[in-house]
């Protein structure tokens, strides 16, 4: 039978110190000496102690989770992006929750609501090509959940975005065609609701 994780009170009883001392030692509080901290952490490991995530949330107002929403992992760019996001998040002790919208606006919104219920500390989102309703931005602001759009970003202002400089790229492409004598240049663009499409057209 698997041994149940210990509590702070059990660790304190074993070491004959107060529960508050154990709690501070586990959180590396400067008021606790190095020897005591090491004793507490060693006993915590021996007793299979696991921090109460709910208690941590109420104390720090953080869940150490980040939500990522993207169209599809089958696209090489997004599979590389999620890998790097997880690497950086892991370095800062954050866990990444990931959802694929498959360019379905309703599914995208469902994932956003799920992340909100899980009280993620922030959301990274690459919009699906069919997303037009951005009312969720205000919803997340009210819930004090930061949101950053990346790659496929909306036209709206006053939101955090990370995306490529498509205007400069398009101008260089057009100049390249013009330099070899082409005058009638066609553009096959993406959905009008995305900033990327607007920048390509305006270039």
Whereabouts are the PLM-identified features?
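Acidic/polar helix N-cap motif
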Residues: 10, 28, 104, 165-166
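Short glycine-/small-residue-rich Rossmann-like dinucleotide-binding loops
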Residues: 27, 70, 127-128
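Short beta-alpha junctions and helix-cap segments that line functional grooves
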Residues: 111, 126, 135-136
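Bacterial carbohydrate/catabolite-sensing allosteric modules
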Residues: 1-3, 14, 46, 87-95, ...
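Short beta->alpha connector loops
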Residues: 102-105, 128-132
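Amphipathic helical "hinge" segments at domain boundaries
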Residues: 38, 47-122, 191, 202
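N-terminal helix-turn-helix DNA-binding module of bacterial transcription factors
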Residues: 1-64
